[in-house]
Amino acid sequence: MTHRICGVDLGGTKIEAVVVDAEHKVRGKARIQTPTADGPGSVVEAIIEAITQAAADARVKPSELSGVGIGAPGAVDSETGVLTRAPNIPGFEQPYPLAETISKAVGCPVKLGNDVGVAVRGELELGAGRELQHFVGIWWGTGVGSGVVLNRKMWHGRGAAGELGHTVIQRGGLAEPSGMLGTMEAYAGRRNMETRAHAAVEAGRETNLFALMEQIGKKRLSSRVWQESLESGDELAAELVGEAIDAIAAAAANVVNILDVEAIILGGGLGSRFGQPVADRVAVAMQPYLFLPESSPPVMVAELGDLGGAIGASLLIGKQS
Amino acid sequence: MTHRICGVDLGGTKIEAVVVDAEHKVRGKARIQTPTADGPGSVVEAIIEAITQAAADARVKPSELSGVGIGAPGAVDSETGVLTRAPNIPGFEQPYPLAETISKAVGCPVKLGNDVGVAVRGELELGAGRELQHFVGIWWGTGVGSGVVLNRKMWHGRGAAGELGHTVIQRGGLAEPSGMLGTMEAYAGRRNMETRAHAAVEAGRETNLFALMEQIGKKRLSSRVWQESLESGDELAAELVGEAIDAIAAAAANVVNILDVEAIILGGGLGSRFGQPVADRVAVAMQPYLFLPESSPPVMVAELGDLGGAIGASLLIGKQS
């Protein structure tokens, strides 16, 4: 029987699904907007729809899949498949048995993992990290997630490792929504960058960020909006992206000082869109924060691109023997 | 034949040597002031003298030792036994074949390790970390060194891991002598605390720190001076120690956010002298910097005490079969 696995990347704005073969090659895909209605029901339906569409695109029935791996933002119990808490997904503020619910509907095994964790694992096994022994993945998007890979394994600690975005680089500095002050994410998370852009406009600064947002037809300052504004020479965009780069660089240098890893891999919505030019700026900005600047590790860009989260999620399902 | 190992802790102010038996029990010890004359010759002689005295105290000849392990501050090549650079030891600004030189003089094998690395390994195998799977040791002294233990092994990365003292917590903040700004050590290293105390006195602040230093007969604000000043209610000492605690807490919380380790072990001259009351203050100060304050790991005090560095160094010599 054909071996087909589905991987789903559940995001705050979209649900991305891929169906891959035994060699991890993408055979089918689908993308659906994440419903914003209250309650988990509509999100569950949308996930099932994305799986069904991706399976159809790969010419298999959902029930013929060897399994579905789902990467979800927030706290995940990978043993039980319960999405403990996902503040960015409407209706998932409370624990929800996501894997079990989807499994019953689709008719195949379902496993759940953290979205950044599975994306970093994707880079480890199939992407920029495939020849590295150790690295730190920094996923720069709405928030800034991270994954620590040591001796070619994800490091979990007591279960909650990888919160580089919430490390402090500026005591008493900017607040993030959680109330923590001066963390890397307070400067670099896209949501917080948008809050700062709003505040700047209210204070009288000029920018094309929000005009571009409307032109493109977005409700948020998406990665594309930031990229286009930056390329147009917008001063506020340049300033806020510059501050985000410095914050990411400080936190990345800290983790290099502590763990002396072989590389930093930059991914996520903003990281992947900005690509190597911005990764190079992060590398330069790391220099003053490194104890040994002469042995600064490379800052690489995630290779699996937009589908990386979904492809990484498919790795949650082991190959059948 | 009796199995006796010597461990040496080479410090900027003193050289501590112990001779231990196969069960790591201390059978002899010696302490010698670190010579301040230029050139490595006098320091090498002092190390040999410390080994000889500790061996005599344990009733063995130096040549009968199974080996000597030396923990040295600075960059160490543990393969070749070369002390690459030890800025705190007069005469060791250039690479020096320390293990080979001592081995020829003493007549037994000599191994070299980083001082904080061997002290943390001592805690891992014989001290506060003996039942932990993973922890970070923070050695609070003249500088602030650290050691990362993962799955009961020291983590070295590409060879230079463990520089938690040089991670940034306050971009653009206080300078440390290396020129790095706003690092934890800039606030918490004893040398930098002394610099700040001098500056405060020049700015008109009152303190008993320097009077106590002279009473005790020291040339530096030693750990004992800080402790006695703090206990006397000195306001400047309380303020600077408080700021050091907050800096250590911020960096410790960062490493917990990244690695989610089971514990922080606090050691070093100041850490060991201040003991559990200050470790408890570090734990409290970590709270606002933790992403998951409810699962804050314990902050423990190193158990091997003053001789921990020398005992840890003895572990560089494996047991003979």
Predicted regions and their residues:
Chain A
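Conserved A3 ("GATE") glycine/threonine-rich loop of ANL adenylate-forming enzymes
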Residues: 13-14, 118, 142-145
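A charged helix-plus-loop insertion that forms the helical arch/lid used to bind
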Residues: 81-95
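General beta-strand structural signal in soluble alpha/beta enzymes
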Residues: 110-114
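Glycine-rich phosphate-binding loop of actin/hexokinase-like ATP-binding domains
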Residues: 130-188
